[in-house]
Amino acid sequence: MASAAPEKDKSKVHKLSLKGSAKLVAEFFQYSIHTILFQRGVYPAEDFTAVKKYGLNMLVSSDDQVKAYIKKIMSQLDRWMQHGKISKLVVVVTDKDTGEHVERWQFDVQIFQTKSKSSKSSKAKSAATNQENDASAAHAATADKTEAEIQAEIAALFRQITASVTFLPQLQGDCTFNVLVYADADSEVPVEWGDSDAKEIVNGERVQLRGFSTTSHRVDTLVSYRLGD
C-alpha cells in the first residue's frame, strides 16, 4: 500500500491502477454475493458473521460449503478481472422445489480501455451466453477519484441493496443460488466450470440500482424479480 502523501492535495490526484481497480471490483463482487444471500434470507441469519467493510457492518456467510463455493468463484474471477475478461456477474436465486428462478442480480462491468475489445464475444461461465458489454457509456464518469470517494460510492450501493427488501417480494420456501460470470469467449476456463443459460426471470420486474466507478471500471446494478402469485 502506498504511503500517505504529506500534502493533502496529493490525495486528489491519486489514481487507482488497473490492477488495483480490478481487485477492488472483484472484492465488491465477493461482498455482494454474501450481502444478497443474507438480505434475501437464502440462508439463516445465524449462518452469517459481521465484518467491517466500506465503513459498514457487512455480513458474510460462515457456512463451510457456501464459503468454499464463493472462494472457488473468486479465485477464478480475480484472474479474469486482472486480464479484463469480465463483462458481468450475475447472482441467481432459485426455488429449490420448482427450479424456478425467482430473483436475478446483475452487475454489468465496463472497462475503460482504449484497446479494441468491442468485437470480442462473451460467454457466461459457470453460466450463460453474453450480450455485448456496452462500452459506449460516457467515460466522463471516470474523472479521477480518491479511493475514499470510490469506497463511499460502493457503500451507498450496499445500502441500496440492503434497502431493496422494502420492494422485493419475500422469498417463499427453500431457495438456492448460482453465480454466473460472463467472460470473453477466449478466456481460459477451469474444467469444473461450464457454460449455462442466462437464467432470466420469466415475466419479471426490473429495477435499476446504483453503480460505482473507478478510473478503470464502471459497475452498474440491476435486479430482476418475479412478482408473487
Predicted regions and their residues:
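Long protein-protein interaction modules used by eukaryotic assembly/scaffold proteins
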Residues: M1-S61, K67, W80-D229
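Eukaryotic beta-rich interaction modules
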Residues: A68-S75
